[in-house]
Regions:
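Conserved alpha/beta-hydrolase "nucleophile elbow" surrounding the catalytic nucleophile
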Residues: 23-25, 103-108, 160
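A conserved short beta-strand
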Residues: 125-137
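Gly/Ala-rich beta-loop-alpha elbow adjacent to hydrolase catalytic centers
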Residues: 107-111, 115
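Short beta-strand/loop motif that positions the catalytic acidic residue
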Residues: 157-159, 163
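C-terminal catalytic histidine-bearing segment of alpha/beta-hydrolase fold enzymes
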Residues: 169-228
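Active-site signature of alpha/beta-hydrolase-fold catalytic machinery across serine-
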Residues: 34, 117-121
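Serine-hydrolase catalytic machinery in alpha/beta-hydrolase-like enzymes
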Residues: 1-100
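Short alpha-helix in the alpha/beta-hydrolase fold that links the catalytic acid
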Residues: 32-35, 143-144, 167-177
Length: 228
């Protein structure tokens, strides 16, 4: 059983997919539950929001890894979080019956970083898509994103030009790197700072719906006896 605490928002009826939302630094598992209702208002998805494993000193919030400098997570705490999330994701797939290819990983700030990590680690199953608000692809010793084998993973990136915590150049670099590797990327910039811009939510929700539908069609095409 996973050591991570988490919250769940069940789908209405049998889930058509799984959405795992990872919060940012200084927050907890409650933070993105409201985002789930906006992204998936018809409750087609089973939603899970994990709590990061590390407590912040003198703060009620949590974080995923230590930060020597932006863009370069501490390798030990980063690796520990990656393995703990892997255990949770595996547990969720088994319990819900939803497969990785029907799963979307999303998050804000550090949570976006962890979504990239879990989607692009070579030893992990590839999800249907990644929803990254104000994040980056981490540079960490002994970890490299496996992009060559993930070209079917769809990516939505939204970042504020006025972000003073994680500069927009990180998002631009991620989009460029992913596109050059052949991944389909939908990229949005706004005048926002370091937060999820509400103006980007309609596009993110539409992307989520489209990604879910594409994953359904792909699964149908791969199933035995599928028609033309």
């Amino acid at each position: 059983m996973s050591a991570l605490t988490y919250r769940e928002r069940p789908a209405d009826g049998a889930p058509e997919g799984l959405l795992i939302l990872h919060h940012g630094r200084g927050s907890d598992e409650h933070d993105l539950l409201t985002l789930a209702d906006v992204l998936d208002p018809t409750h087609r998805l089973h939603v899970v929001t994990p709590r990061a494993p590390l407590e912040l000193p003198d703060s009620p919030g949590y974080h995923w890894y230590l930060v020597p400098r932006v863009g370069y997570p501490d390798p030990d705490s980063f690796d520990a979080a990656r393995h703990q999330l892997g255990e949770l994701h595996d547990e969720l797939w088994q319990r819900t019956g939803v497969k990785p290819e029907r799963t979307m990983l999303g998050g804000f700030s550090m949570g976006a970083v962890m979504s990239y990590v879990m989607a692009f680690s070579a030893e992990r199953p590839a999800p249907a898509g990644v929803l990254a608000f104000s994040g980056f692809i981490a540079s960490v010793e002994q970890w490299q994103p496996d992009l060559a084998n993930r070209t079917a993973v769809r990516v939505f990136i939204a970042h504020g030009k006025r972000d003073q915590v994680i500069g927009v150049e990180f998002a631009r670099a991620a989009a460029k790197r992913l596109r050059e590797a052949g991944l389909p990327v939908e990229y949005h910039e706004s005048e926002a700072g370091h937060h999820i811009d509400p103006r980007e939510i309609p596009a993110a929700s539409a992307w989520l719906t489209d990604t879910l539908e594409r994953s359904r069609l792909t699964a149908r095409a791969k199933s035995p006896g599928a028609g033309p």
